[in-house]
Structures are given as structure tokens and as C-alpha cells.
């Protein structure tokens, strides 16, 4: 199981995988952090596709996910998911964050994708506690992979050394 999960510190926009996950906001129109970086690196076609999705379904709800092509990125697709804003833990944040991971994996599976890369969802400007978020991420992905063997590799892509150390420590308990 754990050989399907890889931990790296990289620029997620540079990865050659089937899908990178964008920690988007509900508007799907780009923003700060990884969301802004993906939109800038991928080019305007990503935003155009996001507008089309909004026309069909409206905003993307917290915990849900949608898929677009990847524009100029090396990845084939971008899965945009909306993580929860941390509000002290009393507003279903854990379940919503778990759903963001699970729904992203489900979209990848439904599109026959084999490699997917996740950023540290909700841990930036949404202020989700990093260790708590990492536990939820690892648990959600591990549970999904137990039920599905189509997805071959899941990358947890850490932006900083703090998240890298947290994930590295927690992944040891899943070996």
C-alpha cells in the first residue's frame, strides 16, 4: 500500500503526472497560493474551462471536485477541489477535507488516471492545522487505495519543509 504513496518537496506545477490537484476556492477563478500558481503556469485555457464549469453547475462546493485539462502544464489534467476554511474544528472541517481528497481520487479513477499529485490542501490561507490536515490526507488516500487498485501512485507534494517533515513522520506509521 505505502509503495503507492510518494512524498516529495517540489513545485507541483512542474510535475509530469496524469493529474495535479488544485486547492481551489469555490469560485474556480484562481486565487493565491497553489491555486494562483497553477493558473499562472497553466495559462488562460484553464480559467476558460473553469468558467464553462461554473456556467453548468455554479460554484464548486467545499469538499467537491471538478476536472479540467492542464493547459501548458506537464500534467494531463487538473482536478480542482475546494478544501474547508478552518473555523476551530466545529464546522465539519475534518469530513469536508477528507471529502476533498476522496472526491479528487474518485474523479481520477473515473477518468482512468493512474498518477495524481496533491498539494497540502487547506493548510495555507485557510489555516487548517498542518498536522491534523496531513493525518486526514493520509488516512483518506490510504482508505481509497485499499478499495481501488487502478490508481498506481499518489504524490503528496509539500511546498515547505514543515509539511514535508509532518508527512514524513506520519507516513512512517502507515508502513
UniProtKB/Swiss-Prot annotation:
NCBIfam families, sorted: PRK00431.1-6 (NF001664)
SMART domains cross-referenced by the UniProt entry: A1pp (SM00506)
Alphabetized InterPro entries for the sequence: Macro_dom, Macro_dom-like
Domain Macro, chain residue ranges per copy: 1-175
Entry similarity comment: Belongs to the MacroD-type family.
Source species: Leptospira interrogans serogroup Icterohaemorrhagiae serovar Lai (strain 56601)
Name of protein: Macro domain-containing protein LA_4133
Amino acid at each position: 500500500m505505502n509503495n503507492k504513496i510518494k512524498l516529495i518537496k517540489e513545485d507541483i506545477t512542474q510535475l509530469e503526472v496524469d493529474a495535479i490537484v488544485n486547492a481551489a476556492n469555490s469560485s474556480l477563478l484562481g486565487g493565491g497560493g497553489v491555486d494562483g500558481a497553477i493558473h499562472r503556469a497553466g495559462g488562460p485555457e484553464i480559467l476558460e474551462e473553469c468558467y464553462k464549469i461554473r456556467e453548468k453547475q455554479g460554484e464548486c462546493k467545499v469538499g467537491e471536485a471538478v476536472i479540467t485539462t492542464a493547459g501548458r502544464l506537464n500534467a494531463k489534467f487538473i482536478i480542482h477541489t475546494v478544501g474547508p476554511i478552518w473555523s476551530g474544528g466545529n464546522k465539519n472541517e475534518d469530513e469536508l477535507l477528507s471529502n476533498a481528497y476522496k472526491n479528487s481520487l474518485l474523479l481520477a479513477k473515473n477518468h482512468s488516471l493512474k498518477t495524481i499529485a496533491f498539494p497540502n490542501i487547506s493548510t495555507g490561507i485557510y489555516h487548517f492545522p498542518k498536522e491534523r490536515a496531513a493525518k486526514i490526507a493520509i488516512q483518506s488516500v490510504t482508505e481509497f487505495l485499499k478499495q481501488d487498485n487502478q490508481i498506481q501512485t499518489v504524490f503528496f507534494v509539500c511546498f515547505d519543509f514543515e509539511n514535508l517533515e509532518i508527512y514524513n513522520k506520519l507516513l512512517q506509521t502507515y508502513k
